Swiss-Prot record:
The gene is rutC. The keyword Hydrolase applies. GO terms for biological process: nitrogen utilization; uracil catabolic process. Homotrimer. Keywords: Hydrolase. This is 3-aminoacrylate deaminase RutC. One of its GO terms (molecular function) is deaminase activity. HAMAP family: RutC.
Length: 128
């Protein structure tokens, strides 16, 4: 089955050569997502909860554009800039995954913009 590109309405232009998501064989792959506005400026610079909420809402939009829901998410890769934000990020994360949680990993690292606090990449399997 061929790959389909997923670009939700209102998406910002990526900073590099990639798209927000792709769909292949019922699997949605969501690119690393940060809390950016439509001009790739970081939103909520000092607020890990607001950034996480924005990131996950953006991911949800990509998955819904592909025909899925957040319940279809099977794996998240989470990148954070400071462990002090871990609890705040998890608090918002739990709101988006209230039932069975997807598998995931979380690492501390630098991100593409200095004010970015969290980046998440996602895989979801859409039921046929």
């Amino acid at each position: 089955m061929p790959k389909s590109v997923i670009i939700p309405a209102g998406s910002s232009a990526p900073l590099a050569p990639f798209v927000p998501g792709t769909l292949a064989d019922g699997v949605v792959y969501v690119s690393g997502t940060l809390a950016f506005d439509q001009h790739n400026n970081v939103l909520f610079a000092d607020d890990p909860k607001a950034q996480t909420r924005h990131v996950l809402a953006t991911i949800r939009k990509v998955i819904e554009t592909a025909g899925g829901t957040m319940a279809d998410v099977t794996f998240n890769s989470i990148f954070i800039t400071d462990w002090k934000n871990y609890a705040a990020i998890n608090e918002i994360y739990a709101e988006f995954f209230p039932g069975d949680k997807p598998a995931r990993f979380c690492i501390q690292c630098g991100l593409v913009k200095p004010d970015a606090l969290v980046e998440i990449a996602t895989i979801a399997h859409i039921a046929k």
